[in-house]
């Protein structure tokens, strides 16, 4: 039997890096880890609620969290930062206030920055959110995968693989379907591969979406 390993954890320190930067005492580690999870969930839900692009999804690439003695720095990488700024005249001030309330911090102890991703359709998380939004709207999964591969192909010179599992198109029996374009060398540690898993809640049940993006640098 094959043994599966997480593509990002497999490449940490080689072609991937951590998205949380901090050190903690043993007694504080669980607290900080739980806070990081809450921060990511709050940011993603806020952007999904307040920002809708033409494709009807928020587009968060990834979130980096840095902790210092008296400061928490949150860097949000999104494909469409202008949409978030245009949504509210105060920009992301409300999200900052929600984060301060969540963490119990003063304004000077929290810093939030919004950074645009140069190639948003090269980010697997943004693509996975797009696939999920299409499946929720009952778009056939094969058409969705083909369209997503075309979107990624415009900005990616390597390869992409998309896998969707569950009751596809409302079928009685769950199955797994996948599509690939280009090269996706999962066995090569030095390969610059980004990965994302994203669940999609549909009227037929939960569908699991996995996307691998290989950048040939």
Curated annotation (Swiss-Prot):
Q: Which Pfam families match?
A: Ribosomal_S3_C
Query: What InterPro entries does UniProt report for this protein, alphabetically?
Result: KH_dom-like_a/b, KH_dom_type_2, KH_sf_prok-type, Ribosomal_S3_C_sf, Ribosomal_uS3_bac-typ, Ribosomal_uS3_C
Supply the alphabetized keyword list.
Chloroplast, Plastid, Ribonucleoprotein, Ribosomal protein, RNA-binding, rRNA-binding
Q: Where in the cell is it found?
A: Plastid, Chloroplast
Q: Which GO terms describe its molecular function?
A: rRNA binding; structural constituent of ribosome
For this protein, the record's CDD domains field holds: KH-II_30S_S3
Residue span(s) of domain KH type-2: 47-118
Task: Report the GO terms under cellular component.
Answer: chloroplast; cytosolic small ribosomal subunit
Name its GO BP terms in alphabetical order.
Answer: translation
Q: What is its main location?
A: plastid
* Family the entry assigns: Belongs to the universal ribosomal protein uS3 family.
Q: How does it assemble?
A: Part of the 30S ribosomal subunit.
User: What is the name attached to this protein's record?
Assistant: Small ribosomal subunit protein uS3c
Source organism of the structure: Adiantum capillus-veneris (Maidenhair fern)
Q: What is the lineage of its organism?
A: Eukaryota, Viridiplantae, Streptophyta, Embryophyta, Tracheophyta
């Amino acid at each position: 039997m094959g043994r599966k390993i997480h593509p990002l954890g497999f490449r940490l320190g080689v072609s991937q890096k951590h998205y949380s930067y901090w050190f903690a005492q043993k007694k504080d580690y669980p607290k900080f880890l739980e806070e990081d999870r809450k921060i990511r969930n709050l940011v993603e839900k806020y952007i999904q609620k307040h920002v809708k692009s033409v494709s009807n999804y928020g587009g968060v690439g990834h979130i980096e969290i840095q902790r210092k003695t008296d400061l928490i720095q949150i860097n949000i990488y999104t494909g469409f930062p202008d949409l978030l700024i245009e949504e509210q005249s105060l920009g992301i001030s409300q999200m900052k206030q929600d984060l301060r309330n969540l963490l119990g911090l003063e304004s000077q102890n929290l810093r939030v920055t919004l950074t645009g991703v140069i190639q948003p359709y090269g980010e697997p998380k943004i693509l996975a959110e797009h696939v999920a939004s299409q499946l929720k709207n009952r778009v056939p999964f094969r058409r969705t995968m083909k369209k997503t591969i075309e979107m990624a192909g415009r900005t990616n010179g390597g390869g992409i693989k998309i896998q969707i599992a569950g009751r596809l198109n409302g079928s009685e029996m769950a199955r797994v379907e996948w599509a690939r374009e280009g090269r996706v060398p999962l066995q090569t540690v030095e390969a610059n591969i980004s990965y994302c898993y994203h669940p999609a809640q549909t009227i037929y049940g939960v569908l699991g979406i996995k996307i691998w993006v290989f950048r040939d640098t």
